[in-house]
């Protein structure tokens, strides 16, 4: 798995598994809504009244309708646990 997808794949997979409705904003400003049916390295299959194949290079933002509980085995680089403050 490529380093850049270590966060992307578990996030999209959690959205797919839990059937969480999403809003997908494209780089041209168009908003698409539906549920993620499937995805691969290059596309997301979005299901609503019809299925749409959306190319990832055209996506700006993926916004879940509710919080997502995605758990990947390792923590992304640069993401450290919060330190407790000692007052």
UniProtKB/Swiss-Prot annotation:
Q: Which PROSITE patterns match?
A: SM
Report the CDD domains cross-referenced here: Hfq
Task: Give me the ranges of the annotated region Disordered.
Answer: 65-87
Sm domain sequence ranges: 9-68
- GO biological process terms, semicolon-separated: regulation of DNA-templated transcription; regulation of RNA stability; regulation of translation, ncRNA-mediated
One Pfam family, short name: Hfq
Q: What is the recorded function of this protein according to its Swiss-Prot or TrEMBL entry?
A: RNA chaperone that binds small regulatory RNA (sRNAs) and mRNAs to facilitate mRNA translational regulation in response to envelope stress, environmental stress and changes in metabolite concentrations. Also binds with high specificity to tRNAs.
Q: Where is the composition biased (Basic and acidic residues)?
A: 71-87
Q: Which protein, by its recorded name, is this?
A: RNA-binding protein Hfq
Entry's family note: Belongs to the Hfq family.
Family matches, as PANTHER family: RNA-BINDING PROTEIN HFQ (PTHR34772:SF1)
Q: Which UniProt keywords apply?
A: RNA-binding, Stress response
Q: Which organism is it from?
A: Vibrio campbellii (strain ATCC BAA-1116)
InterPro entries cross-referenced by the UniProt entry: Hfq, LSM_dom_sf, Sm
The keyword Ribosomal protein belongs to this UniProt entry's keyword annotation: no
